[in-house]
Amino acid sequence: HLLSRRQRQMCIRDRVYAVAETKQIKTNSGVELVADDIIAHLVGHENEFDAVVFSCGDAVPVFAQNADKPYNIDLMSVLKAFGEKGKILIGHCAAGMLFDFAGVTEGKKLAVHPLAKPAITKGQATDDKSVVDGNLFTAQDEKFVWTMMPEVLKVLK
């Protein structure tokens, strides 16, 4: 399969990393997925990627119960490394809260789920549907992700 120069410029390569011990994961809704790899294998390879997209879903209660697990420690390490390098962090729902926990939101505005607002201590939680502030792209929840997509696509080109 050959791509024209324009097509190559428009391609966005992606890899899905499971925040788990194995690549085989199941969503809280019961959907089974096989990721490309596990989050532990992304640690130390942050320079190979331009952005992280964190999809929240109902992950936060599970995260809270398992915050001390190696895969969640790796997740926080990856988010911190991407943020400190000024790389793009994209997420919705409570993703902004995790970015805040990772220590990469100082002085930045975030769109977060209303229930996550009180947990934001370094950044500034807003009531906006979505917010782009520097390298942080956040949406209040999944139904508002579309409101930031033009900016996401612009920066990823």
Residue ranges, per PLM feature:
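Single conserved hydrophobic/aromatic residue that forms the stacking wall/gate
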Residues: 1-12
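Catalytic nucleophile loop
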Residues: 52-56, 75-103, 110
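N-terminal beta-loop-helix "entrance" segment that forms/cooperates
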Residues: 17-38
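Short amphipathic alpha-helix with an adjacent loop that forms part of the alpha/beta core around
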Residues: 39-48
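Glycine-rich phosphate/pyrophosphate-binding loop and the adjoining helix
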Residues: 121-157
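A conserved active-site-flanking secondary-structure segment within enzyme catalytic domains
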Residues: 105-126
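Short internal beta-strands
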Residues: 13-20, 92, 109-113
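Glycine/threonine-rich flexible loop motifs
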Residues: 60-73
